Regions:
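Class I S-adenosyl-L-methionine-dependent methyltransferase catalytic core
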Residues: 1-288
Length: 288
């Protein structure tokens, strides 16, 4: 019903689709008298109106219908879910395309592939068209990954929808001591609706992961940094210890009086009850 909802809402007359899968959107478009153009990695698509194409292969052009479409719909595979397989299971890889099966990729590689597909589909659309992408949340081996938070957003974000999902793997499992677990069962998917405002501009937002030492962060305060050092160390800590931990770090380079700033911050933390002043120039982290 998701494709039908958006066809009605945006008065779609020509729907394009990446990751056409079992042909549900094709069937909906046929029933609603909407022109359909779809592609899928499957060498033997289940519907005659779905073309075989590897969206990750930039030597292959998208079908002409993408350039006329009012909307493109994407419901990509969910990378790194071990219990679901497409190539070699739901369909046979007769042309050596399994390497592009996003389902078999790790999360980071899979999301890069999905974002590449998103940009390719967006680039083909005429101005004023919409790109709709349905993605999920993944919990695997104790890690929670949000596809939505890692999704590229080209053009203008029109709206976000939250869709109830009634057959998630998370919802079918019984977890030991579920009531005391910090996790809730995953029973939803996310839908991004994106509008292409112009024909020439490619404007997009893509999440980027940063990793750095807090001592080199320009956004961390002296209090943040001193507390991080204290929490990461054991026993009684001297002022000289904090000097050594911070000497040469970016936080100290912009302050010629950084040692005095460290002493001031240590005193403030002791007054706040976060550190204990145990002697002259000696400090200890107070565990809770």
């Amino acid at each position: 019903w998701i494709p039908a909802f958006f066809i009605n809402k945006f008065h779609v007359s020509h729907m394009a689709e990446v990751f056409a899968g079992s042909g549900t959107t094709y069937d909906v478009c046929k029933d609603m008298n909407v022109v359909y153009t779809g592609i899928d990695l499957n060498p033997n698509p289940p519907r005659n109106g779905i073309q075989t194409m590897d969206i990750l292969d930039d030597s292959m052009d998208l079908p002409d219908g993408f350039y006329h479409a009012d909307m493109v719909f994407l419901h990509p595979p969910y990378p790194s879910i071990n219990g679901i397989h497409y190539s070699g299971a739901m369909w046979k890889d007769t042309i050596g395309c399994a390497k592009s099966d996003i389902q078999e990729m790790d999360f980071e590689t899979g999301m890069n592939a999905i974002n590449y597909a998103m940009m390719r589909a967006y680039n083909a659309l005429p101005a004023g068209s919409y790109e709709v992408c349905l993605v999920g949340e993944i919990r695997s081996k104790g890690q929670y990954r949000s596809m939505y938070q890692n999704l590229v957003i080209p053009g203008t974000m029109q709206q976000t929808y939250i869709k109830m999902q009634h057959n998630c793997m998370s919802g079918t499992r019984v977890y030991r001591n579920q009531a005391a677990s910090p996790y809730a069962l995953i029973e939803h998917e996310m839908i991004a609706v994106i509008k292409k405002p112009s024909g020439y501009e490619i404007s997009y937002v893509i999440p980027k992961k940063y990793s750095l030492d807090i001592r080199d962060s320009l956004y961390a305060t002296w209090k943040d940094i001193i507390m991080s050092i204290a929490r990461s160390s054991e026993g009684i800590l001297s002022g000289d210890f904090f000097y050594r931990e911070l000497e040469g770090r970016k936080k100290t380079l912009s302050n010629p009086n950084w040692k005095a700033k460290i002493r001031q911050t240590l005193q403030q933390l002791a007054q706040a009850g976060l550190l204990k002043h145990v002697g002259i120039g000696q400090w200890q982290y107070i565990t809770r």
